[in-house]
Amino acid sequence: MPHFLASHITLPPMPFTQEGYTFVYEAKQCNDSSQSLILVRYEDNEFFLRKAWRGNKNNAILKCEKSTKTQPTGIIKNALKILCAYQKNVISHNLNKNTPRQNLQSPYFQSMDFFLDFAKPCLIEIGFGSGRHLLHLAQSNPHFMCIGIEIHTPSIEQILRQVQLLGLENLYIINGDARILLEILSSHIAQGIYVHFPVPWNKKHHRRIFSPKFFQESLRVLDNNGVLHLRSDDEIYFQDALSLALQQESISLEIHKNQQEVITSKYEARWKKQQKNIYDLKIFHTYKNTNNEKNVKNTQKNFYFDKILRKNLDNYKNFPHKKIANDWFLHIDNLYCAGDIYVLALCFGDFNQPQSKFLQIEFCNNVSARYIGSNPIPTQAAIKAHKYLIQILTQE
């Protein structure tokens, strides 16, 4: 993650604009003055930088707030370079010249919001890694939109560069949680969902991508005879996935061991060199619901706020605050303040696929509230958590 260290960090008066970047305000944490957030805007991007004093190391750090980071990484690095130039006592940094892929702003990199009304026939790969298989899918299926979802930033930047070099126009890339994507996609639009060499998490099953809910959403999103394809070198993971598959209705299965695929991924080549077994589980959806409408659960796309009372923030000292329900939770981690602007750090939604967001509330001529960057993804759990948050902020 781009950052710099200094014995003391000095910031110019805000707001100020330089090189197309606007540094809007610095909001200090209410119960810890050593922590603050700096809101930055650049073109259509909006993100926070976090300034923190590290007492145990006797220095200060300025870095991007992870939950608001944007792509490409070069946008964040350039913002940090601007502020780094104001410092007289920089200890170290990793803000050297951007690589081409760190500067690439691709129209094929999309947010989750883009897919709320997406209805084109598609192929989906979850955790594409080096991208070899995903690029092959896109090249071999020019009449399908291919969607790759990944959480590893260097892998995302690498494949976006390849998309540009190869001139592909049928491939979208997302940085996010695949389980959330599946919940918001329309029904029966995918011909294939590919999960190749996922992390097994044999001691932390709750972190696995394969779960009963994952199967439910995958089969809903798959078209008739669409395939969910797991490829793994871990026999325990394979057996557990097979057990889950056998609990589903209206499917057919194919199982292969050490079958050669057209494309060999970087990890697969490593496992084969170590003479490890490779397991394939192909699950075909053989029943199509006659209801072709969009998944009607996800109808709320806007997160509105009623009248927020300032006293509820000024008097609210119960941090962190947690609300845990049967199928959702809300965690108010902290409160930041910059004059008439308050920022709530939030984590909420489903226990196994939480969303982290910052809520900005401004008390000027009119009260306004919005989530920084973009709204949460409207999963059922996120909607319930949002409604509870409204109760906290508006109660008399």
Swiss-Prot record:
Q: Does the keyword rRNA processing apply?
A: no
Associated pathway: tRNA modification; N(7)-methylguanine-tRNA biosynthesis
Q: What is its EC number?
A: 2.1.1.33
Gene Ontology molecular function: tRNA (guanine(46)-N7)-methyltransferase activity
Please name the Pfam families in this protein's record: Methyltransf_4
Where is it found, in Gene Ontology cellular component terms? tRNA methyltransferase complex
Q: What keywords tag this UniProt record?
A: Methyltransferase, S-adenosyl-L-methionine, Transferase, tRNA processing
Q: Which InterPro entries match?
A: SAM-dependent_MTases_sf (IPR029063), tRNA_(Gua-N-7)_MeTrfase_Trmb (IPR003358), tRNA_methyltr_TrmB_bact (IPR055361)
Q: What is this protein called?
A: tRNA (guanine-N(7)-)-methyltransferase
The source organism is Helicobacter hepaticus (strain ATCC 51449 / 3B1)
